[in-house]
Structure formats: C-alpha cells, structure tokens
Amino acid sequence: MPLTLGQSLFANFLGNSPRWYKFAILSFLAINPILFYLNPFIAGWVLVIQFIFTLAMALKCYPLQPGGLLAIEAVIIGMTSPTQVLHEIQANLEVLLLLVFMVAGIYFMKQLLLYAFTKMLTKVRSKIVVSMLFCIASAFLSAFLDALTVIAVIITVAVGFYSIYHKVASGKDFSSDHDHTSEAPEQLNESELESFRGFLRNLLMHAGVGTALGGVCTMVGEPQNLIIAAQANWQFGEFAIRMSPVTVPVFFAGILTCFIVEKFKWFGYGAKLPEAVHKILSEYDAYEDARRTPKDKVKLIVQALVGVWLIVGLAFHLASVGLIGLSVIILNTAFNGITDEHALGKAFEEALPFTALLAVFFAVVGVIIDQQLFAPVIQWALSYEGNVQLVIFYIANGLLSMVSDNVFVGTVYINEVKAALLNGQITRDQFDLLAVAINTGTNLPSVATPNGQAAFLFLLTSALAPLIRLSYGRMVMMALPYTIVLSIVGILAIESGFLTDMTQYFYDSHLINHHTAAEAAGKALGGH
C-alpha cells in the first residue's frame, strides 16, 4: 500500500534513523517553546542536555540535522539571537578556519604520514611499544599542531591501513580499485577483521588521549589555550613554563596508563595485530618501497619540508592557524603538481560537515551565554580562596568541559576571572594561578567524552568510526582509565601546593616575572 504524504514526510525526516529517535527529536522541538515560556533558565539547560543527546547518538544520525533543528528553534523562540550566534562564530573564526584549511592541508601530507606510521607499525612488533609510540607522537605533534589536525592525521593513517588490508583480504592486489566500506563476509576472515578493528580502536584512542596530553602544554596546542594566553599576556615560553607543574606529571601519568591498560588488557585495550594483517601491511610497505619513483621521493621530501614550515609557523605563531593551513595546501599542491579542482575538492570532504556542526554548536553556546547558565557555578567558585579556589575551578571546568565545548568553557571562565581581577576580588598572582587551573581543567578531564574534546568528536563522526565499530559508549569506556588518572594527577598537582610552590620557584629563578592588574586592564575583555 502506498504511503500517504504524512507518512512519506515522517519516513524522509532524519532518513534512516530509528523511529524512536525521530519521535524523540520531534518531542524535544514540541516541549522546548513551552519550557522556555515557563522557565528560561531550566529550558536552557534542557536544550544543552538535548544537544548532548544528539551528539551521543552520532552513529544513529549525524548530529548536524537534529542539533541544527534544535538550534534553529532556539533562535526563533528567543533563547538566543542571530546576532549572538554570529558573534560566537566571529569569536571562534580561527577554529573554523583551522577546520576548513588545516585538516585539508594535512590531507596533502597523507603520503608522508602514512609512510612514517607504516614504518612504525611494521618495524615495531610489540603492541605496548607501538601504543606508547602513537601516544607520545600524538602528544608531541599536538604541542605544535591543533589536536584536530593530529587526529585527522591518525584517521588518515588508520583508513590507509584498513583499506590496504580490506583490499587484499577481498582477493585484490595493491593496485586495484576497491571500496573498503563494503562488507564481504565470504572472503574476509571475520575474527581476523575483528582483531584488526580492535587494534585500530586501541591506537586511535591512545593517539586521541596523546593529543590532550600534548595539547594542554603550549599556547598553540588547543584553541582555548590561545584565548587564555591572550587574556593573561603570556608568550609561548611563559605559557609552557607556567603550565609545567601540572602538565609534566600528567604527561608521565598518561604514558604510564597507556602501558598499564595495554599490559593488562583492561577497558578494551590489548588487542593484538593479527599475524596475517601484519604480513599484508609489511608486504604493502615493501611493494611501495620497490615502486617508489624519483618523483614520489621528491613528493615525500616536499611534504616533509612543508611539515617543518607547519611546526615552525605554529610554534612562533607567524600567522593564524587557519592561514598556515591554507599555506600548507598551496605549497603541497603547487610543488607536487595537484592542480585539478576535483582532486582539491576531496581534501575538504572530511572536515566540512564537522565545521557546519561546530557552527550549530555556537548557537547552543549563544543560549548558554544569553540565559547565563554558568553564572551560579562561577559565583560559587569565587567564594572560596587560595588552593581550594584553584581546585574548585579545575573541577568546575573539568565537569563542564566533559559535556560542553572546552573552547567555550575556557573562554567563559577566563573572562569571568578577568572581571573578578579588574573588580579587585582577586590578586594578579592568583589570577595567573587560576588561568593555569582553567587551562588544565578544560583540557584534561574533558577526555571523558567526545563532547569535551573536539578531536574525539571529530573521530566519532568520521567515516572511520563505523568501519572499526567505535561507538560513543565504547569511546567513553576506553577513555575512562585516562579520565580518572589525568583528572586525579591534575587535582593532586594543584591541591598539594606543588603548582604554587613551583610557580614561586620560577619567579625566584627569574624564569617568569610577576604581571600587574593594570597590564590585564590594558587588554580589553575579548572573546565572549
């Protein structure tokens, strides 16, 4: 029997999503205006929870559509305004440029990265050592590149490995065209494929946590670090030194956690690379080496030189992150002969849906600001003093960063603390310590969920996640040991007085200097 127009509309709404999910989104859209009329504050928090729900269900339906509908309705009923949404996007333009250009730029360095990581994987047989290498390499790269860039690299590498194996296991040779997303059980060894998926999940999670370990250390590591450094008037070196009493112990604790979960096969870790898969990857490596022409070698050299420019440009902040990304695209494509528009377009496919999703997120951020959802938490935290205040800010930041975007959380908190400094509620030295607590609080506990770490959300919504069966719940479970260890070590470094003692030592050694409140007043309250 043919469908009625109404049934057809419902069938088309959110496509292949489950019926219960469609009903849930429709009920949210029906309830929100009523709630907003009754109590705007509660309606604001309900909207945030609903948006988090759409992110949690990312594998049922890409969050752009349901989240976007909720955001559009929020603007229509007056929870926020189009002006506020535009202001949020303008304030975070660097983050959007980063997604559009930097992720695409890395696409053109894929051959070099695949070469480096393939060597790492085929030459090192110990799973524990490979895991630690991936974690440390991600941390190092994240100190200079944005975490999203690093995760984009690792995703590229993993998709490369997966497609090579899938191609050979499906009975084709290395040079054949092949759709690695197809499921062909008659040719693929299911248990072997499952082990390989587990292995890739492990490596991606270690790498994802590595990006958080490295990203917290420097002012270019994460977008919110740049905002915090600007408000505190810190340069690259001073930022790294001030963070080190928390970031150095946390880094070593993170690497130790990587070793322990692999050694004891806890939380879904410890999946071994099947021998047959290792053989295929090794053969592919030898095959690639044998057929590498002088032109191919020059391409690798160009990509390596562009990689050096990328790290130098970011470390010394020679231009905004997105513009450096654009220069990476231009240099790589110009010198490696990629001039076809279609070939250029493929580089932008991975990041643009996520860029649109982030723009929708800024609409929700607009609601949080207009409805002052965070105000009670901030006033409560400022009512304490000394180390207790630092710990509370760290925990409050951490909890909110687990469920909200950490760029937003960091920006809101640093601006509130800046206002407290200018009002004379806290001293300049306490402000500097609070800036450390805010930066570490937004970066470390936020590994708990994909909502907190943009890199994790990017991984979850990538084309790779369904291939290796990486769901939201599995991601949270695998991140759990890291969440616990990083959060606790961070708290101990602050609560024990180690942060304040080391900061005093840095002052005494003239590694850093005291700043003044007047200096802070000179820097207008920016961001939000």
UniProtKB/Swiss-Prot annotation:
Q: Cellular component GO terms, alphabetically? A: plasma membrane
**Places the protein is found:** Cell inner membrane
Its main subcellular localisation, reduced to a broad class, is membrane
One Gene Ontology MF term: sodium:proton antiporter activity
How this chain sits in the membrane, per its record, is: Multi-pass membrane protein
Report the catalytic activity: 2 Na(+)(in) + 3 H(+)(out) = 2 Na(+)(out) + 3 H(+)(in)
User: Where is coiled-coil annotated?
Assistant: none
Q: Which InterPro entries does the annotation name?
A: Na+/H+_antiporter_NhaB
Quick check: keyword NADP in the entry? no
- Membrane-crossing residues? 23-45, 66-86, 95-115, 130-164, 203-223, 241-261, 310-330, 349-369, 390-410, 448-468, 475-495
**Entry superkingdom:** Bacteria
Q: Which UniProt keywords apply?
A: Antiport, Cell inner membrane, Cell membrane, Ion transport, Membrane, Sodium, Sodium transport, Transmembrane, Transmembrane helix, Transport
| NCBIfam families recorded | NhaB, PRK09547.1
Similarity-based family = Belongs to the NhaB Na(+)/H(+) (TC 2.A.34) antiporter family.
The job of this chain, per UniProt, is described as: Na(+)/H(+) antiporter that extrudes sodium in exchange for external protons.
The identity of this protein, by name, is Na(+)/H(+) antiporter NhaB
Organism whose genome encodes this protein: Shewanella amazonensis (strain ATCC BAA-1098 / SB2B)
**Annotated gene:** nhaB
